[in-house]
């Protein structure tokens, strides 16, 4: 705010690829903190990379065995 910035467009990004596609717990609280500090939030955009032809996920053919 002291820099003269009073409005934001937010790009939200998770790990993506062949890992998790949901943002972590800090994303929502960071967004809420920005809104509470008086920033005007214009647009929230999800820019998580989504695979088109992914490498196999870790865990192997039979998955994670507990």
UniProtKB/Swiss-Prot annotation:
UniProt-recorded Gene Ontology molecular function terms: structural constituent of ribosome
Positions of the UniProt region annotated as Disordered: 46-66
Pfam families documented for this protein: Ribosomal_S11
Alphabetic keyword roster: Ribonucleoprotein, Ribosomal protein
Segment forming the signal sequence: none
Any Gene Ontology biological process: translation
Family the UniProt entry places it in: Belongs to the universal ribosomal protein uS11 family.
Protein name: Small ribosomal subunit protein uS11
Source species of the chain: Nicotiana tabacum
